[in-house]
Amino acid sequence: MTNTPSDQPLKQVNQRGAARLAAVQALYQMDVGGTGVLEIVAEYEEHRLGKELDGDTYLRADASWFRSIVAGVVRDQRKLDPLIGSALQDDWALSRLDSTVRAILRAGTFEILERKDVPVPVIVTEYVEIAKAFFQDEEPKLVNAVLDRIAKQVRGEQRK
């Protein structure tokens, strides 16, 4: 039996967690719609982070954390994508992945590389939870496995 999002218990989200979720959404929007980084960051800060939009209230998020992830992924994408590609199974290309999964993996990989002050288990868990918000089956497992492989390669550690 699969759970719909309304069947799952709500977890309290911290401001960094909300920033990560917003960053994944922004990266997805940039990937699919071709929106530029300055435009997307301004849109999220002015209309989404902690704001009400179309009857939905967005979570309060750490705006500087959000900006750091989005700008960092865009800046470092040529470094991130090969790392992600090498952590995928041999017969999978990054381009074959769903745009949301790509956004999650890019953001998680960026944090593993650049945010040495954040423990790997925190990063991996946060992005697996984001994957679970969008997918119910294999995608969260894929996110977990790929980010674990990248963490081991980059930091020499795995999620415990």
Swiss-Prot record:
Gene Ontology molecular function: RNA binding
Stored Pfam families: NusB (PF01029)
One GO cellular component, as annotated: cytosol
Keywords of the record: RNA-binding, Transcription, Transcription antitermination, Transcription regulation
GO biological process: DNA-templated transcription termination; transcription antitermination
Disulphide bonds in the chain: none
UniProt entry tagged with the keyword RNA-binding: yes
Family: Belongs to the NusB family.
NCBIfam families from the UniProt entry: nusB (TIGR01951)
Protein role: Involved in transcription antitermination. Required for transcription of ribosomal RNA (rRNA) genes. Binds specifically to the boxA antiterminator sequence of the ribosomal RNA (rrn) operons.
Protein name: Transcription antitermination protein NusB
Originating species: Sinorhizobium medicae (strain WSM419)
UniProt gene name: nusB
